[in-house]
Amino acid sequence: MRRRNAGARLLGAWLLLVLAVPASAPAADDIMSPGFDDRPLQEPVETPEWFKLSFLDLHDDLTEALAAGKRGLLLYFGQKYCPYCKALLENDFGKQDITAYTRHHFDVVAIDTRGNRLVTDMDGTITAEAQFAVDQKASLTPTLIFYDDSAREVFRLVGYHPPYQFRAALEYVADRHYRTETFRHYLARAEGALHLDEGTLNHRDFFSAPPHMLDRSHFRAQRPLVVFFEQRNCHACDVLYAGPLSNAATLRLLRRFDAVQLDMWSDEPVVTPAGRRTTARAWAQRLGLYYAPTLIFYDESGQEVMRLASVVHFYRLQGVLRYVLSKGYRQYGSFQRWRRRAGASAPAPASGADP
């Protein structure tokens, strides 16, 4: 603030300068703005506490990750004074859903590209961190390298990526899309999704409008229920809407369900099928959900039948819809058993039928 005895001319010039700046001008520390300062930081950036405390024997780290039920190992190559690393750690790993998803699927080990700790690589070769980074061609920071259960590199992400693309990269590896398609193709499959704006969920007319009173514990409903747990800026959600949910046959099946769409991170009130009053966020947390979109199917009495918590396409989604509509779970107990024995030939019953 200017002191009171500052000259009127100087104060006027200052006010003109302030007014000349557009109100919507992005902050200089916003990495997505033209004014972002990418010079080395003045203060070092720290990696999250949940990163693995490692002796940098990478094969041992991978073995431990797989033993814990994870997809593989994620190496984070960074520097202490790297502004792009700071942006990734704060903007991407600073988001609750990204952190939860990453921790569920990967152990993350940090490599300082200027460090001197000894690293034992997947082949047993021992080098210092700095040389290891050179050998791995991690010349730009941050660089993320993913290793799968065969101890081979399956994907790398170089530089900073906004949360939307970063989530997509994690999903691309965790769901093993690298086995069948390039990351470019995986991203392109979401281009047909309908967005009202960047911060909204996708919309379809088969969703019931709020308030969501889903209680089925006192009175049996006439139709099964499917709840879509989603989140904003969700690449996998966009893929679902651009693909399976734009298919006429899929939509015909879905319109025979009661269908509800929830933002799994919102405080929107909801009454669950069991009659519990809660919020979308609290319900998703109680269900242990970490992936979006997750589709949970309930029968007419409010009992969960099954859930889809990974990327799903036409064949599988339509199969699950038929499985629930035909009440195949009553006879076969599981979707896979139903699929093997009846799913290929069993049509969904007419609306209201109860086989």
Regions found by a protein language model. Give the residues of each.
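Alpha-helix initiation/capping motif
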Residues: M1-R2, L19
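Intrinsic disorder/low-complexity signature
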Residues: R2, P26-A27, V109
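Bacterial N-terminal signal peptides that target proteins for export
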Residues: R2-L11
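Bacterial N-terminal signal peptides
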Residues: G12-P22
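Active-site-proximal cofactor/substrate-binding loop regions of enzyme domains
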Residues: T102
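A fold-wide structural signal in alpha/beta-hydrolase
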Residues: D107-V109, D258-V260
